[in-house]
Design a protein with these regions (language model features):
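C-terminal recognition in membrane/secretory proteostasis and scaffolding
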Residues: 1-113
C-alpha cells in the first residue's frame, strides 16, 4: 500500500490524513511518532457521521493497530468492505479545552436507503 493510495482512501472515507512524524508528534504532545493524524474532516462523509475530529490520531481500525499510513490504508480498505466497523482514536488535549482528551471509539455504519 503506497502512502498516496492510503491518503486517497482516507479522503474517500472523509478525512485528510498524514503519518504522525516528529513535527506532528511535538504539535500534538504525543509520546511516540505513531499513528495517522487527522488534518481535516470532510463534511457529509462517513468519517464526519462517525464523529472523527481534526487533531485526533487514528490508532486502530476494526481492532487492527495503526502505526503507519500503510497500516491505515490496508485496514481502511478491509473495513469499508463491511457495513459496520469501528475507528479508535486518541484525541490530545486542545489548548482551549484541556479536559477534553483521551481514547475514543467511533462507530461507522453503512447508510441504508
Amino acid at each position: 500500500m503506497t502512502k498516496e493510495k492510503a491518503i486517497r482512501l482516507g479522503e474517500q472515507f472523509g478525512i485528510v490524513v498524514d503519518e504522525v512524524d516528529a513535527e506532528i508528534q511535538k504539535e500534538l504532545g504525543l509520546q511516540r511518532a505513531e499513528g495517522v493524524a487527522v488534518l481535516e474532516v470532510i463534511g457529509g462523509t462517513m468519517a464526519e457521521g462517525a464523529g472523527i475530529k481534526v487533531r485526533s490520531v487514528i490508532k486502530e481500525i476494526d481492532k487492527v493497530e495503526i502505526k503507519t499510513l500503510a497500516d491505515f490504508g490496508w485496514a481502511l480498505a478491509r473495513a469499508t468492505k463491511q457495513c459496520n466497523f469501528t475507528v479508535g482514536t486518541y484525541e490530545p488535549a486542545d489548548p482551549g479545552d484541556p479536559v477534553g482528551w483521551g481514547v475514543n471509539f467511533h462507530f461507522v455504519g453503512c447508510k441504508r436507503d
